[in-house]
Every structure is written in structure tokens, then in C-alpha cells.
């Protein structure tokens, strides 16, 4: 499986992402509450909740905070009527973009998403317009310094579907999204500590960004991520190191 660009091509945005940590926590808590409310508080029987827990821990959320969020969902203390909404569209340079939202007001959410596309030279598409280009997977990321062959052997034994290493030494392990927690636990038991673990939408094709389209795509992603209702933004934009160096 070809590596995708979510991690490798957004490193230059890390400082900006760190500045949004408060908003990220709010969104993760919303997902924890919703997942627990819909599927129960046992992560072993609720893959969506387990994925949300892994994401929370990857973002250094405390156990106390995430446990309170789960308790809110299980106990019915949260009376909001959140629903998951997926929007699809085309960004600068013909990039395919998928936006996962949790919202209690569809009209508000679609207006904010459409505004971001309009401001950044893209357009909101119809259901199914780009979804066929993405596959839902679990992704476990390991920092440089590990032996790829050893990780691969352990990952495949744990039930992973594929493993990809990058030039900088980062390793991504891909799993069926429902098995993300199980595979991560097996690799942890084998001595490999993950840098992050989350469910993602992996693109099957790439759209190369140049010095003109790359900044527009990053602006679109930033605007979408600034929307309170937007949980995740997935895209197939590929930004080369040469182009990234100009940003």
C-alpha cells in the first residue's frame, strides 16, 4: 500500500496544530461522549470508542478527562443530539476532500463547510463524489528508530494488513479500522510503543500540489479544522518536500 500524505506532508503545520490543542481536545471529548452514548462504554465491544480513546491518548489527554467524557455518554448526562455527517468536495488543484463532522445542526455545519470551500477555490460536492477514492483504515504510526523488518513481522502476526516506511524512518502500520485497538495492543505487548493510533480515510490516488495550489489547500484544511463541528479532514493532496520548503 502506498503511504498517504496526512502525516508526512503536514509536518510543517505542526506548530499551527499545537496552537489548536484546546479545540482538538474539545472535538475529541465530543467524539468520546457520542461513541459511548451510541455504543456503550466498553472499548472492547465498541470499536468507535476504542479508536476515540487511542486518539485521545495520542494527543496526551489525561485518563481522568477521557473517563469523564465516557461516563457522560454512558450515563446519559449529555442531552445534545449529535449526528455524524460526512461532506465531500474538491479542493485546490483538483484534490479530493472528505470532511467528517459531529453536529446538532446540519444547516449551520454545511454553511460553514461550504464557506471554507468557496473562500479557498474549491467546491462542495454531492454524496459519493469523492468517497470512492478513500478507504477507512486504522493507522498506527511509529517514530523513527525501529527496525522495519522486525515491526513488519510483529504487525502481520498481530493481524495488520500492511506496513509502510518513509524516508525519514517513520513507520505506518495499516489495519482494518475495527481492529485498530487489538493490533496496537499486540504491538505494544511486543515492545513497540506507538506515536499515534487513529482511524483514517486513506486515498487510493494522489493529487500533486505545486507552489500555487499547496498554500490554498493548507488554508482550506485550516479553515475546515477551525469549524467547531468538523472532527476530521481527509484529502489526497501530495506536497513534495521541495514545495513544502517554500511554504
Swiss-Prot record:
Keyword Oxidoreductase in record: no
Record SUPFAM superfamilies: YebC-like
Protein family: Belongs to the TACO1 family.
Entry keyword set: Cytoplasm, DNA-binding, Transcription, Transcription regulation
This protein's record includes keyword Transcription regulation: yes
Gene Ontology CC annotation, any one: cytosol
Record HAMAP family: Transcrip_reg_TACO1
Record organism: Serratia proteamaculans (strain 568)
Major subcellular location class: cytoplasm
GO terms classed as biological process: regulation of DNA-templated transcription
Pfam families noted in UniProt: TACO1_YebC_N, Transcrip_reg
Protein name: Probable transcriptional regulatory protein Spro_2779
Localization of this protein: Cytoplasm
GO terms, molecular function: DNA binding
Amino acid at each position: 500500500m502506498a503511504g498517504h500524505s496526512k502525516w508526512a506532508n503536514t509536518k510543517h503545520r505542526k506548530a499551527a496544530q499545537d496552537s489548536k490543542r484546546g479545540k482538538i481536545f474539545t472535538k475529541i471529548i465530543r467524539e468520546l461522549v457520542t461513541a459511548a452514548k451510541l455504543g456503550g462504554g466498553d472499548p472492547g465491544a465498541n470499536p468507535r470508542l476504542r479508536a476515540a480513546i487511542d486518539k485521545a491518548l495520542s494527543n496526551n489527554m489525561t485518563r481522568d478527562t477521557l473517563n469523564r467524557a465516557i461516563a457522560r455518554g454512558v450515563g446519559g448526562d449529555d442531552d445534545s443530539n449529535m449526528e455524524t455527517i460526512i461532506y465531500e468536495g474538491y479542493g485546490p488543484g483538483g484534490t479530493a476532500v472528505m470532511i467528517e463532522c459531529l453536529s446538532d445542526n446540519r444547516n449551520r455545519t454545511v454553511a460553514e463547510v461550504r464557506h471554507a470551500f468557496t473562500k479557498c477555490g474549491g467546491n462542495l460536492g454531492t454524496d459519493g463524489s469523492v468517497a470512492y477514492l478513500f478507504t477507512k483504515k486504522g493507522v498506527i504510526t511509529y517514530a523513527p528508530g525501529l527496525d522495519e523488518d522486525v515491526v513488519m513481522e510483529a504487525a502481520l502476526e498481530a493481524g495488520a494488513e500492511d506496513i509502510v516506511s518513509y524516508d525519514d524512518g517513520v513507520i505506518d502500520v495499516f489495519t482494518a479500522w475495527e481492529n485498530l485497538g487489538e493490533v496496537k495492543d499486540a504491538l505494544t505487548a511486543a515492545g513497540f510503543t506507538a506515536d499515534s493510533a487513529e482511524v483514517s480515510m486513506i486515498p487510493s490516488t494522489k493529487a500533486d500540489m505545486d507552489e500555487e495550489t499547496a498554500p490554498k489547500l493548507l488554508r482550506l484544511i485550516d479553515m475546515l479544522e477551525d469549524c467547531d463541528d468538523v472532527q476530521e479532514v481527509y484529502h489526497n493532496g501530495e506536497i513534495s518536500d521541495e514545495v513544502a520548503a517554500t511554504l
